[in-house]
A protein has these predicted regions:
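Hydrophobic alpha-helical segments and helix pairs
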Residues: 1-20
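Mature-chain termini and adjacent capping regions
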Residues: 1-2, 27-34, 57-59, 146, ...
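Gram-negative outer-membrane assembly/targeting C-terminal domains
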Residues: 137-159
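Surface-exposed, charged, gly/pro-rich loop-and-adjacent secondary-structure segments at domain edges
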Residues: 33-42
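Gly/Pro-enriched, hydrophobic low-complexity segments
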Residues: 7, 16, 24-31, 45-142
């Protein structure tokens, strides 16, 4: 059951850890694939899989704590196999590796991720219960909607 206390997240908190994971709030909310500056910088194999490296930079008027993001895109399945997020000095701040890809209805989906964050933190994310075609209403993402959430069966959370 979700907690009864709610906290707004401001710009200053966007770099903070999301629920103690190696991801930040910004990693969940902002997609570098939507940034205006996109450049293919070359090919590289990832574990024997041919990839194209896409470099993304936030355009004018877009605020991000990352100066650039590089994504290794599987050329055949069009799935990011690695994402590296860089600070303004060019240092990798966060690396996300796709460890399992699922073929679902003709689409390839990254379902298991390993996230390497600041300070050596590592988080494994599994999409073993991933469902497609699920619809959500805007009200599901309100404070009232979050109070109605139930933990998935078998998640270990009390219901």
């Amino acid at each position: 059951m979700p907690p009864n206390n709610l906290k707004s997240i401001g710009a200053a908190e966007m770099k903070q850890s999301l629920f103690g994971s190696a991801l930040s709030y910004e990693d969940i909310i902002d997609s570098p694939f939507t940034w205006t500056q996109q450049t293919i910088v070359g090919p590289e194999d990832m574990d024997g899989t041919p990839c194209q490296i896409l470099e993304s930079k936030p355009g004018k008027g877009h605020t991000s704590s990352y100066s650039s993001v590089k994504s290794w895109i599987d050329s055949r399945r069009l799935v990011p196999l690695r994402i590296e997020k860089y600070d303004s000095s060019g240092k990798v701040v966060r690396r996300i590796n796709t460890t399992r890809v699922l073929l679902e209805g003709g689409d390839s989906l990254p379902v298991d991720l390993k996230v390497y964050g600041p300070g050596g933190s590592v988080t494994h994310i599994t999409g073993s219960r991933l469902k497609r075609g699920v619809s959500y209403a805007d009200t599901d993402f309100t404070p009232e909607g979050f109070k109605l959430l139930n933990a998935p069966p078998g998640s270990g959370s009390s219901e």
